[in-house]
UniProtKB/Swiss-Prot annotation:
Keywords: Lyase, Molybdenum cofactor biosynthesis
Any one GO biological process: Mo-molybdopterin cofactor biosynthetic process
Superkingdom as given in the UniProt entry: Bacteria
Name assigned to this protein: Cyclic pyranopterin monophosphate synthase
Any Pfam family the entry gives: MoaC
Enzyme kind, highest EC tier: lyase
Associated pathway: Cofactor biosynthesis; molybdopterin biosynthesis
Family: Belongs to the MoaC family.
Binding site for substrate: 76-78, 114-115
Amino acid sequence: MDNKLTHFDNKGNAVMVDVSNKNETERIAIATGTVKASSETIELIKSDQIGKGDVLGVARVAGIMAMKNTSNLIPMCHPVMITGSSIDFEIDSEKNEIRITATSKVVHKTGVEMEALTGVSIAALTIYDMCKAVDKRMVIGDIHLVKKLGGKSGEFNF
């Protein structure tokens, strides 16, 4: 594994990595994270009883929109034309948590790890925003890259 930081020049200045000589290949990234909430909040989400509306539906759209706009949020992130993206939710009533999984796909010269991570993060923040009136103790956490496929560095599995 190459441990060299790529977003700095030899003087320590931040730069956007030059990907012009890289090959376009299919790249896939999967990220995940959780929102822990009270059992009452989880039940309100499951029964679509949150006053602001369909929590998971809105969070799904927000996460996908975030993936498409990642380069506007992360300064050195390249803009990419995402070819596929999804946000999925798994509610675990025993743990009182919602697991969010974001998948991002592209055929490009650079990967989409940041897009998947941003999708999870914004979906989680949207859940928090929509439910904060009933539960201010929600905890967003465990956001990480699960899998990366394609590109020069090959496959990564957490």
